């Protein structure tokens, strides 16, 4: 976290990717072929997913030259506490990217989010917890390999799917003006996966450090 506060490399790289992806999607969009309300949810979750992966990879990569993880392992700290600390730090980065991307998508695609902004924020935050829980575990496994940039998406994306699908469905319905009661099932699924991923990844993390 201190390294990131000094360099801001993780935040800047993730934000740069989000802005670039948003720009490409916007200029490739033909409003006569696809309605903005149909496109915006997909664009939003593509940006969240891949900017999050980039941020997760960078958050571990910047620590490699200083051997910060070795220092943590030598300290009298529970391995689970190390995981939770990394998770909270990564969650902060992901939420920051989401806080920039969500208004940008709403503005560019002319989506009115005022009426359902709080349920939408709840969906986004629940999904962020699930994605970061899994991503932090796999990023710690992949960072020390020579193909970390390739290995992290291969490991993490299959486990992202159970989180992204209900989140995208809930986002699409909320942006279409549906009632919050229509997305309560998706919210319950997100909450359930968050609990499962958080507990399982916390228990598995100490074993990944021993490899």
Positions of PLM-derived features:
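Selective transmembrane-helix segments that form parts of the transport pathway or gating/packing helices
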Residues: 77-106
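A structural motif at transmembrane helix-loop-helix junctions in multipass membrane proteins
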Residues: 113, 123-157, 209-211
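Long, hydrophobic alpha-helical segments
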Residues: 40-56
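Membrane-interfacial helix-loop-helix connectors in multipass membrane proteins
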Residues: 28-39, 103-125, 171-187, 208
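Transmembrane helix segments
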Residues: 27, 138-182, 186-189, 195, ...
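Aromatic- and glycine-rich beta-strand/loop motifs that create alpha-glucan
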Residues: 1-14
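Junction motif at the cytosolic side of a transmembrane helix
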Residues: 194-211
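Transmembrane helix boundary and interhelical loop/hinge segments in multi-pass membrane proteins
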Residues: 4, 53-73, 87
């Amino acid at each position: 976290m201190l390294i990131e506060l000094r360099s801001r490399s993780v935040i800047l790289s993730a934000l740069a990717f989000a802005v670039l992806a948003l720009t490409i999607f916007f200029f490739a969009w033909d409003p006569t072929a696809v309605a903005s309300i149909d496109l915006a949810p997909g664009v939003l979750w593509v940006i969240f997913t891949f900017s999050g992966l980039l941020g997760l990879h960078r958050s571990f990569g910047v620590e490699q030259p200083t051997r910060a993880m070795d220092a943590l392992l030598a300290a009298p700290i529970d391995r689970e506490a190390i995981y939770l600390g990394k998770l909270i730090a990564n969650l902060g980065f992901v939420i920051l990217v989401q806080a920039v991307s969500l208004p940008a998508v709403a503005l560019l695609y002319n989506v009115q989010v005022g009426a359902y902004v709080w349920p939408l924020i709840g969906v986004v935050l629940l999904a962020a917890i699930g994605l970061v829980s899994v991503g932090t575990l796999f990023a710690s496994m992949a960072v020390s390999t020579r193909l970390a940039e390739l290995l992290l998406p291969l490991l993490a994306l299959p486990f992202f799917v159970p989180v992204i699908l209900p989140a995208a469905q809930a986002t699409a319905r909320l942006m279409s003006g549906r009632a919050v009661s229509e997305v309560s099932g998706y919210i319950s699924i997100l909450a359930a996966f968050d609990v499962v991923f958080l507990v399982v990844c916390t228990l598995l993390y100490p074993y990944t450090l021993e490899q």
